[in-house]
Amino acid sequence: MGQPGYFAKPVPSFGEPGSSLLIVGLAPGMHGANRTGRPFTGDYAGNLLYSTLHKYGLATAAEPLDANNQANARLSLSGCRITNAVRCLPPQNKPEPAEIRQCNGYLAQELAALPQGAAVLALGTIAHAAVLRASNHKAKDFKFAHNARHELANGLKLYDSYHCSRYNTQTKRLTDAMFHQVFESILEHHKLRS
């Protein structure tokens, strides 16, 4: 988006490759990851995500931003990695199917780097569908539902959550407790390690 001080490039994943949990979001937010260069950093969704990761011992800090409103350099992840179905800022903040297809190879590489039996958390239906496409599964065989767990043929476990967007939390489609419950389900079934 050509704004001064913005990262405005494809946003790379954050966290160690091959971690036991891969969190897949939708796309970089206009004034979030598009500005900071880190997934879920600088927008409301990131505040909920990183505070939840910190609560469960998966992040060293709850705050994605530092005092200068930049990506918190002291924040690191343990046992998890964060990526998006689309790596670039989409028009109107919603990716088109062609963009999802274009970026799906990157997501397939992320999935291939995961250890056997790893967990994948899809934040929203678009991320859910992108994970299924990248892992060569049919969407009709794995219906999206909040806090659902799907066993994929490649040994991965796919978990679903409503996206942690401001809209979903303001409308109470997703509450903090509901989001925490998803992480509790994941941690119940997986020992997360870097």
Regions found by a protein language model. Give the residues of each.
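A polyanion-binding, active-site-adjacent surface
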Residues: 1-144, 152-193
